[in-house]
Structure formats: structure tokens, C-alpha cells
């Protein structure tokens, strides 16, 4: 019973579309074939000049929201508030998860709660410089869970952490096109005792 505890954890995946219409079908297939089954796939699309074939989402009965404006990278975290699962996984449109990614995240979260991602950075100094050896994840594999300053491309977290993400709102003068990765990790560091991690 304890061995299969992770199987009871529910997960929503948030996909987004903006610049890479060629990856959507492969992403949906990868998520539908996870070893830990995903409960809901939710798709957010900012306005785009590219034409998107949404049939993989329609055929699978997945949730779709298409905006007539570009609300940037932060909008998908607002859309994630609609998730009704234990965990949420937000995936960039340039990322195809391996078939055990969700299983790996659920298992890792049991011992390393917080924010998990596919690429993690450790900053060298106050100017946020990063050397190649301080990048971890798919392009610099780590064999153990690695604590990092920020993660990107894929964010896996308990749904409750959405309230931490939105605890401080960015200024209306700030761009919503970047910065969600630093903001999320900063909010977790500032308001919780959890960390930012890259699973092995």
C-alpha cells in the first residue's frame, strides 16, 4: 500500500502555446503516456501569428483556453488556478517530458517539497551570473536531487503553492513576458521553508 502511495496523487498539466506550434502533438502524446497518469491536461494559448492544430487536445477532451492577447508567461500560472488536483505541472512549449517525468516528480516531492523543474540554475554572484557547471537537469544530468536557485522549462509543484506565487504581484509597469521563474523561486524562498529542486 505504501509502495504505491504516489499512484493516488492527482496531477494537472498546463501546456502553453505561443511560438512552437510543431511540438503540441508530441507533448500531448508524451503526457498521455506518462507512467503516473495525469488527471487533466489544460492548454493555454496566447495570441500567436502561428496556426495551431488543436485536434490532439480536442480529440482527447482536454481543456483549452485561447486568448486574443499576449498575456506573457505569467498567464499560465493564473490559468493553473483552475486545476483541481494535488499537483500542477506547467510545461513550456519547447519541452517534451520523458514518460517517467511525472512519476519522478511525485516521488521526489515526498522528500524534497517545493518547486521542481527540468533545468535548474545556481547563481554565481549578486549579478545572477551562471557558469555552465552550475546548470543542472536534462543538459547537465544530476544523479541525485539538486537544490538550485531557480528552475525553468517545466515547473512541478503542489497546488497550494499557487497562493505563494501570487502572494506578491508584479508592478503593472513590469513586463509579463519574462521573470516568472525567478519570481516563483523567490516567493518560495521568502515565504516558505521549501526549496527549488531538480530531480535526478
In which residue ranges do the predicted regions lie?
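Short aromatic/hydrophobic "clamp" motif used to bind/position activated sugar donors
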Residues: 88
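Acidic donor-binding loop at a coil-to-helix junction in glycosyltransferase catalytic cores
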Residues: 177-183
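Short beta-strand/loop segment that forms part of the nucleotide-sugar
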Residues: 38-49, 65-66
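Active-site-proximal specificity loops/subdomain of glycosyltransferases
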Residues: 50-83
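Conserved catalytic core of nucleotide-sugar-dependent glycosyltransferases
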Residues: 98-170
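Short, acidic, metal-binding catalytic loop of nucleotide-sugar glycosyltransferases
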Residues: 29-38
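N-proximal low-complexity "stem/linker" segments adjacent to membrane-targeting elements
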Residues: 1-30
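The conserved acidic donor/metal-binding loop of glycosyltransferases
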Residues: 92-96
Amino acid at each position: 500500500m505504501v509502495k504505491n502511495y504516489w499512484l493516488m496523487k492527482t496531477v494537472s498539466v498546463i501546456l502553453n502555446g505561443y511560438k512552437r506550434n510543431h511540438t503540441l502533438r508530441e507533448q500531448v502524446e508524451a503526457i498521455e503516456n506518462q507512467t503516473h497518469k495525469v488527471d487533466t491536461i489544460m492548454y493555454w494559448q496566447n495570441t500567436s501569428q502561428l496556426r495551431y492544430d488543436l485536434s490532439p487536445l480536442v480529440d482527447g477532451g482536454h481543456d483549452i483556453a485561447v486568448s486574443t492577447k499576449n498575456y506573457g508567461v505569467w498567464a499560465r500560472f493564473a490559468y493553473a488556478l483552475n486545476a483541481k488536483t494535488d499537483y500542477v505541472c506547467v510545461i513550456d512549449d519547447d519541452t517534451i517530458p520523458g514518460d517517467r517525468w511525472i512519476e519522478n516528480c511525485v516521488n521526489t516531492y515526498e522528500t524534497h517539497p517545493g518547486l521542481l523543474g527540468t533545468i535548474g540554475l545556481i547563481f554565481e554572484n549578486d549579478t545572477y551570473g551562471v557558469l555552465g557547471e552550475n546548470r543542472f537537469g536534462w543538459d547537465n544530468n544530476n544523479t541525485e536531487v539538486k537544490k538550485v536557485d531557480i528552475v525553468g522549462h517545466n515547473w512541478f509543484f503542489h497546488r497550494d503553492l499557487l497562493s505563494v506565487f501570487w502572494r506578491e504581484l508584479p508592478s503593472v509597469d513590469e513586463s509579463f513576458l519574462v521573470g516568472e521563474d525567478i519570481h516563483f523561486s523567490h516567493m518560495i524562498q521568502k515565504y516558505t521553508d521549501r526549496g527549488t529542486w531538480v530531480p535526478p
